[in-house]
Design a protein with these regions (language model features):
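Conserved catalytic cysteine-centered active-site region
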Residues: 37-61, 89-140
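Phosphate/pyrophosphate-binding loops at sites that engage ATP/ADP/AMP, CoA/4′-phosphopantetheine
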Residues: 66-81
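Condensing-enzyme catalytic core mediating Claisen C-C bond formation in acyl metabolism
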Residues: 1-56, 158-231
Length: 236
């Protein structure tokens, strides 16, 4: 585990955007055995969520909306943003990085430091560490974007429909002379457990066209989802 302390840096503000589609967990009752959804809600505390499925809203759409809301709220001059970090596992495209698209859509022409990361559940602490490190290296104000949206993922009976909601969050991290407490972050990565959270097919290790030819596209699509979700829900 690594510990970081950043002095003279603050989180100036945060805004969130969600899709228009609002769902209650009880909407999924018909997909599961009686009592399963109720048990899930009791264990997780999740009773409702926002879902991008069917409305065509992507991660960049949500993050752009959140960022514009934050700029307006804080009355920020966009020319003062000198770094943009976007963390998502649901990018708009394989290439280019979604951060580049967001930079263009937000009109951040003077922002040269722009990049993506695909970290999942720990996106915020890792993203905050990246933002703070870049400020220590010379940036003054970073726009950190964290979000995921699955506009093409339908309802399934393997509990991913219950677990995942969609949202985009914009955070302004900036240098300050204020007398405030430092930002302390502890992060750890356990690479040996990579198979516990994996989508095995679709990239260069197991290209989707090859898998589809040998075992069928439906197998690849199902196994990607089933493997990821079974590990996520049933391993410690």
């Amino acid at each position: 585990m690594n510990f970081f302390e950043f002095k003279g840096i603050k989180i100036a503000g945060m805004a969130t955007a969600v899709p228009d589609r609002h769902q209650k967990m009880s909407d999924y009752d018909y997909l599961f055995a009686e009592g399963e959804v109720e048990k899930f809600c009791a264990a997780t505390g999740i009773y409702e969520k926002y879902n991008a499925y069917g409305v065509g809203t992507t991660t960049s759409d949500l993050c752009v909306a959140a960022a514009n809301k934050l700029f307006e709220k804080l009355n920020i001059n966009k020319d003062t943003i000198d770094g943009l970090i976007m963390i998502t596992q649901t990018p708009d495209y394989f290439v280019p990085p979604t951060s580049c698209i967001v930079q263009h859509r937000l009109g951040l022409d003077n922002c040269g430091l722009v990049y993506d990361s695909n970290i999942g559940c720990t996106a915020f602490p890792f993203g905050l560490q990246m933002a703070c490190a870049n400020i220590m290296a010379g940036c003054k104000r970073i726009l950190l974007l964290v979000g995921d949206a699955n506009p093409n993922r339908g309802e399934t009976s393997n509990k991913d429909g219950l677990l995942f909601g969609d949202a985009g969050v914009a955070i302004i991290v900036e240098k300050t002379d204020e007398d405030i407490s430092p930002i302390n972050i502890a992060i750890e990565t356990i690479g040996s457990g990579y198979k516990s959270l994996i989508t095995p097919y679709g990239m260069e290790r197991h290209p989707l066209p090859v898998v589809a030819q040998t075992r069928g596209f439906e197998f690849a699509a199902y196994y990607n989802n089933a493997t990821y979700m079974s590990c996520l829900l049933y391993t410690s």
